[in-house]
């Protein structure tokens, strides 16, 4: 199992963790913070889009690839643009709040479509491995999402929970 560390800026300043950490998860919406030669999992940026508004799948991927180009690296892994089910906007601020079950099915469908979109571009994204996100507000939804994504995934892909 490989663990990719995110939000390292705060931890590194306090604990000087760079010598031990080799795998980082970066968001295309934030300033990258990883040592030279680190292995990068490039997140979709969907978390920040809860506040800004969602992109299309293509816009999300273009943002990820532009981020790589700007910062001169190629990710080891790249994440699909799933629809997060535990973040909502309330009165101009993002809060941690799980969606209702009925609304959760929309997130499942959108997340499966995001994985399909990325899988269709597998060859052009090489050598990056795909991280196919899964969502759901309950076990039935997660099972539906994971099962559908397993149908389109390749053995070298990762499932993101």
Segments (PLM) and residue ranges:
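Non-catalytic, usually N-terminal nucleic-acid engagement modules in DNA/RNA processing proteins
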Residues: 1-119, 123
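Glycine/Thr-rich beta-alpha phosphate-binding loop at enzyme active sites
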Residues: 95-104, 129-161
